[in-house]
C-alpha cells in the first residue's frame, strides 16, 4: 500500500485530510468488536497519540480483523471523519484493512498499567508502551536540540575516542579494554600483567570523558563540543548512576568560569524550550501521570535566571538550616544529593550554580583559585535531580598543573600530550559536562536513569 500518511501529519494538518481517503499503517494498541462493527486504536510510531479506526461487517475480512491480537500490524484505507462529540477529534472509517503481521496472543503489553520495574525486564518491547514511547521521543528531540544549539552558535562537533589510555577524572573507576588471555596473561618480572604485550601496547580503558581530547580541539577551533557515550565502572546501584551513559561536553577558548556558566544556562534553557515546543503531547502525558508539577517547573526554568552561590556559602546555608540530613555537612565534604536538592528545591527554589569547590574533591585539571584551597569549578543543581552539569575553568598554567598532578600521584608521561598544549599558545579556557540521561530525567520527570536510556547498563545488568 503506497502513499501512506503518518498519524503525526494527520494530527498536525487535520484540515488537509478531513473527508478524504487516507492510508495508514501501524500496530494495534486496542481492539474491541461486536457482531456488526468494531473499533481499533492504532499507533504508527510517528506520534504519541493513537488514531481510532472504525470498521464494520461490510469488510470481507471483518471476522478475521475482529479477532486480531494486540500489537498485530495492519494497513488501513478509509475516510478521515471529524467526530466533534466524541473523545477523539476524528476517526478513520475503514474501507479496507490488510493484516501485515499477526502478534501472538501472549503479547506482554496488554491494556493495563505496568510497573516500570516490569517494563525494564522487557526492554526490547517497552518502547511500545505510552511512558517509554514518550520518553524516547523526548530523548531524540533533546539530542537534536543539543546539536542545533551548538551548531547555531558556530561550535565544531568533535568526535573523541571511546578507547583511551588516560583517566580524565583520575578516579580509576574504568572498564579495561584488553585482548590478553584472562586465564594466562603474560607477566612482567615483578609478577604484574605485562600490558606491553596487549593490543595497544599499554593499559587502555573505555573513556570516562572526552574532555582532555576536546581541549585539544578547542585550542584550534575555539568553540567545540562532543556528544557521545562514556563509561564508569562505579558499583553504584542507585537511580542516578549507570555504567554507560551519554555526555555533552563543550569546550570554549578565551573563556573563564563565568562564560562557562552563561553557556550552560543558555544551552539548558534552549533544549528545554525546544522540547516543550516539539513534544507538547509527551510532556502533557508526563505532567498528568509521572510528575504533576512538571510543566510548571520547566516553564519556571526557561523564564527565570539561575541562582549562583559559592561552595563555602552553600555549606553555611546547609549548616544553619533546620533540616536533618543523613550525611553531616562540613566544609570540605562533597555535597550529597540530599544537600543539593535542599539547596535547589527548598532554599533557592530554582536551578543553582555552586562555584569554587575545595580542590581536594575536584579533578586535577581545574584551575586553582588565588586562595590555593579552591578551584574555579561549578556544579549546576536542578530541582528533582541535584547535580546535572559539572564544569570548570581549566588550568592553563603548566607549572601549576604539573604541581597538582604530582600532588595526586598522576604520571606526567601518561598526559604528555595534554601538558604540551600548555606550551604552544595556551590561553584561558573552560568547559562542562552534561549527563544526557539526567537531562532527560529532568525534562520528563522520570526518576530512574534506567528508564531514560534504551538499554541500561548497570551493575549486574547487561541484558539485551
From Swiss-Prot:
Annotated Pfam families: tRNA-synt_2, tRNA_anti-codon
Highest rank taxon of the organism: Bacteria
GO BP annotations, alphabetical order: asparaginyl-tRNA aminoacylation
Enzyme class label: ligase
GO cellular component labels: cytoplasm
Catalytic activity, reaction form: tRNA(Asn) + L-asparagine + ATP = L-asparaginyl-tRNA(Asn) + AMP + diphosphate + H(+)
Xref: PROSITE patterns: AA_TRNA_LIGASE_II
Keywords assigned: Aminoacyl-tRNA synthetase, ATP-binding, Cytoplasm, Ligase, Nucleotide-binding, Protein biosynthesis
Location of this chain's protein in the cell: Cytoplasm
One GO MF term: asparagine-tRNA ligase activity
The enzyme's E.C. designation: 6.1.1.22
The family this protein is said to belong to: Belongs to the class-II aminoacyl-tRNA synthetase family.
Subunit structure and binding partners: Homodimer.
NCBIfam families documented for this protein: asnS (TIGR00457), PRK03932.1 (NF003037)
Protein name, entry field: Asparagine--tRNA ligase
Organism whose genome encodes this protein: Clostridium botulinum (strain Alaska E43 / Type E3)
Gene that encodes the chain: asnS
